[in-house]
Amino acid sequence: MNYLSNVAISRQPQEGTARLMKKLGLRVTSYWHKSRKYNSYKGKVGTVAKNKLHRRFRTSIPHQKITTDTTEFKYYEDGIQKKCYLNPYIDLFNSEVISYHISKQPSYQSIDIALNQALAVTSDCPYRRTFHSDQGWGYQMRDYVSKLKSHRIFQSMSRKGNCHDNSVMENFFGLLKQEIYYGHIFSSFEELEQVIVIWIRYYNTKRIKQKLNWMSPIQFRLNYQNN
């Protein structure tokens, strides 16, 4: 489920993710092994859209350009390695995670849940929206393509095997995993899920960016709306 509005998190500006994890009693064991990138490409299984974004990642209009992708995490239960998957949607206006879903399997349902939330959040955009992704199987599905068309949304896809066409998502996943995942072993799905949820809230509300005039994504959006 989406916890953007439901997770209780400290309001102290200097409190980082590690301290929040400690406060919530989340225990992890360190290790240093960088996981292989998850690849959702299964060939041409549906409709492959043209790359309409062309790496034009900047926009001065909230909710106009949205990008998405899927990434994989590993955790352990009773000594057995298992996996979970994160499907976030990011607004290129302010790099805010506007919706996401975490699941135990790489399913279209998980992509669709996050998509529906993103459609609702961005429905106030006065211009035609563009939703960008890679050529993963879920984004080629008939239901996904039809849903974007029904909302008059341009669908855009990266060129095959070109991660730079969706570098915003690549950088986001890299940052997330560097700060809360690499160097840790999680003992349950719930533990890993909670840490991801906490970090996304921290990222949206606390993590300042130079390109956002040293504001967090949500601060930048609110400042824009109030001016």
Regions found by a protein language model. Name each.
Residues 1, 17, 21, 53, ...:
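Mobile genetic element proteins and their domesticated derivatives, centered on retroelements
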Residues 1-61, 162, 216-224:
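Basic, flexible linker segments flanking DNA-binding modules
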Residues 39-40, 44, 133-135, 141-142, ...:
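RNase H-like two-metal-ion nuclease catalytic core shared by retroviral integrases
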Residues 55-98:
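An active-site-proximal beta-strand-loop segment
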Residues 64, 96, 108, 116-119, ...:
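Retroviral integrase
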Residues 82, 101-124:
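Active-site beta-loop-alpha junctions of metal-dependent nucleic acid enzymes
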Residues 94-100, 155-158, 182-183:
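Short small-residue beta-strand/loop micro-motif enriched in glycine and branched aliphatics
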Residues 149-153, 175-227:
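C-terminal domain-tail junction helix/linker
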